[in-house]
Amino acid sequence: MLSKLLRLGEGRMVKRLRKVADYVNALSDDVEKLSDAELRAKTEEFKKRVADGEDLDDLLPEAFAVAREAAWRVLNQRHFDVQVMGGAALHFGNVAEMKTGEGKTLTAVLPSYLNALSGKGVHVVTVNDYLARRDSEWMGRVHRFLGLDVGVILSGMTPDERRAAYAADITYGTNNEFGFDYLRDNMAHSVDDMVQRGHNFAIVDEVDSILIDEARTPLIISGPADGASHWYQEFARIVPMMEKDVHYEVDLRKRTVGVHELGVEFVEDQLGIDNLYEAANSPLVSYLNNALKAKELFQRDKDYIVRNGEVLIVDEFTGRVLMGRRYNEGMHQAIEAKERVEIKAENQTLATITLQNYFRLYDKLSGMTGTAETEAAELHEIYKLGVVPIPTNKPMVRQDQSDLIYKTEEAKFLAVVDDVAERHAKGQPVLIGTTSVERSEYLSKMLTKRRVPHNVLNAKYHEQEANIIAEAGRRGAVTVATNMAGRGTDIVLGGNVDFLADKRLRERGLDPVETPEEYEAAWHEVLPQVKAECAKEAEQVIEAGGLYVLGTERHESRRIDNQLRGRSGRQGDPGESRFYLSLGDELMRRFNGATLETLLTRLNLPDDVPIEAKMVSRAIKSAQTQVEQQNFEVRKNVLKYDEVMNQQRKVIYAERRRILEGENLAEQAHKMLVDVITAYVDGATAEGYAEDWDLETLWTALKTLYPVGIDHRDLIDSDAVGEPGELTREELLDALIKDAERAYAEREKQIEAIAGEGAMRQLERNVLLNVIDRKWREHLYEMDYLKEGIGLRAMAQRDPLVEYQREGYDMFVGMLEALKEESVGFLFNVQVEAAPQQPQVAPQAPPPTLSEFAAAAAAKASDSAAKPDSGSVATKERAEAERPAPALRAKGIDNEAPPLTYTGPSEDGTAQVQRSGNGGRHAAPAGGSRRERREAARKQAKADRPAKSHRKG
């Protein structure tokens, strides 16, 4: 219903866009008369008009006309009216729903050119590195011709290369790269280390894939956590001895396991414990569950493979081996234990954001896709994006045949091979979509037996994929591809002219970026030849019936099925599609497979006879709708919980930014000092009369914070009335704040004597950054732990989300208070020296004395900064202190960063891709439950904190 309501205004929007296209057409004649130099000069003219205050909306028709003409001159491609309409829809911040083959990549040139004129940057987001590089080179030719800079962000780039790419007018890249750069910028220790320059306008290609499929998986930067891995091995030993349906049960549909009473007793017996579910043993339950899941739900060579002693995950939808990707929550370690390979460290979150919240940072967001219809409600609800269906340039004439359902998988594949062989014999190109590498290889063997020549796309190399897909429309071509392989590349009947021309030029050693002038000259020479060859072949293919798309299994999302179908019938070409299914397919097994099997058995049909029944088609559609709804709920839930973190993240990141941008922090440090002293005094004077206050304890606590210069007995004696009871809280607080300010001024003089003028400001910056980062990491850790168990609140009739919001807020406020206290303690007590003239390879560890840092703690946690236990000012005098040094070094603060791991969604959104970053030694293999690590982290934090005596109240 909501989808229908959202689509009510579509007709009006399309009419409005038609008017825009007509206006652009009216300007085209004048623009065509301009020389290349005059066309290029238009860019500067537009930039000046924008700088003078002209609105981009008013500039749209002229800018679109100029960009359209440039594309024609450079690429020999002129935007159709429907592409101009699509470009306008993108500029107005909508999702343009354009069918496959309608030229989405070329459409994006128009709004990206227009919005780049403001100088604030445009980000064009694609699904993989190959497409980002291809589009930046291919469409970049148009932008460069018009005098704009184009950059591309790829996964292996250095920070300097990234910074240069972001500084360009238009930047191409993948959603993961943009998101990780944002997180890394908010972990940077200086403004110079940051690479992004704001979030002005984003055009998301394949918007459904990025904003919907991938939105279930947050982007996470993590580092290794301490812990022991022997429990993984212990449970990997126990679980094979347990019997399914005796000791435990498995729900394949929900992918969960449940341990029976007999199973609990068996585990208790094996471990020699009395009660598995008592508090002390509760971490063992997650080890047991993970070991059972590893046994029952994760199959070798289907869900993962073992290569060179490493467990590598296979994406269930694309069939890709995802190098470096690891499951979270100890699941990967459980699989490693099952396969008896080295168990690698469990990771701790250092920074995280969901794609939903990352893309909501943009002032304006838009997107393109061929299949947004089924998700219009979600795009509107979460991103406030309207979906505008752009008419096709030519009417669609593809024939979508009804599904054929076979009893067994073997019978299904035999029928597929028969069909393919028949089509190949008459010269019709065939594209076969499979759901896994295993299936595509099985089908490939069957085709080889039948002597049908074919290409197999196992989706490992995007570049090769694109080349094969570009030729998949040639006469008699048979291509076996996993569902998502080769996305973003058009299958043109007779062969893709642009790709084949580009291929020939690259074979000659020409490149659009390295040798742009030679490439452009040769391009116009080669293009007509290739066009003629392809046109001749296209006629033969059309005669044979166009591209035949054959799906071997239904995907759990209707949208992915539609994408596969949409590869045929582009630009008014003839085409055909059909899905072959069997009762053994994943979707059938999960929903009503048993009912259908009973029906087929009753009908007593032979295995090789398919059924075409409306009931079956309805059942499949219903199953897909259920899965889509479940996934939408999952994404909404992820967003609701991340919304709590998002508010906190904004506060912390804004504070970090303020510190990094060089704001004078003296005032902030003073405010923190006053707040901390006030909190100490409030704690000591909260209850009772003045004579009940334990000032002795208060002074002991204050001495751990800063060198107190007054005695509480003197305060009482100097009181005018002379009675101890006459000392008020205000007088006490006032005296202590004045004393703390005196001590801080002295501290500043000492620091500047060691490290030169302005050293205190630098120390304030270093200390605040270090403490904010560490406290934020600890807070993320605590929030992860809170979220893990919050679902149980529902049993007490409480809304888990409300509880999470309330407790998360309390924890955040507590963290901010602890942050102030720790920062003040550091500013007074951290050991400072002038930085050496020559940078040392490795900083020397300070000697383990009471007045120095706890070296053991610093070694354990490379990012933790310890404090001295005594309240004295620990400044180390150096012989060369008289000589002014360029900077200071605070021991325990400028620590080595741990190796980082990046986790994010893969192209289909279900997978989590990780890659280890540089920055420090590789951590020793470690595991341990989150609870154990949390306790260890707490003890560590306590060890690092200056001793603080208990205060009353």
Swiss-Prot record:
EC class of the enzyme, as a word: translocase
Catalytic activity: ATP + H2O + cellular proteinSide 1 = ADP + phosphate + cellular proteinSide 2
CDD domains cross-referenced by the UniProt entry: DEXDc_SecA, SF2_C_secA
Low complexity composition-biased segments: 854-867
Topology of this chain in the membrane: Peripheral membrane protein
Pfam families xref list: P-loop_SecA (PF21090), SecA_DEAD (PF07517), SecA_PP_bind (PF01043), SecA_SW (PF07516)
Keyword Cell membrane: yes
InterPro entries xrefs: Helicase_ATP-bd, Helicase_C-like, P-loop_NTPase, SecA, SecA_CS, SecA_DEAD, SecA_motor_DEAD, SecA_preprotein_X-link_dom
Region (Disordered) residue spans: 854-953
One GO CC annotation: plasma membrane
Keywords, comma-separated and alphabetical: ATP-binding, Cell membrane, Cytoplasm, Membrane, Nucleotide-binding, Protein transport, Translocase, Translocation, Transport
Effect of loss of the gene: Essential, it cannot be disrupted.
Subcellular location, record wording: Cell membrane; Cytoplasm
Source species, domain of life: Bacteria
Assembly and binders: Monomer and homodimer. Part of the essential Sec protein translocation apparatus which comprises SecA, SecYEG and auxiliary proteins SecDF. Other proteins may also be involved.
Protein name: Protein translocase subunit SecA 1
Record organism: Mycolicibacterium smegmatis (strain ATCC 700084 / mc(2)155) (Mycobacterium smegmatis)
Primary gene name: secA1
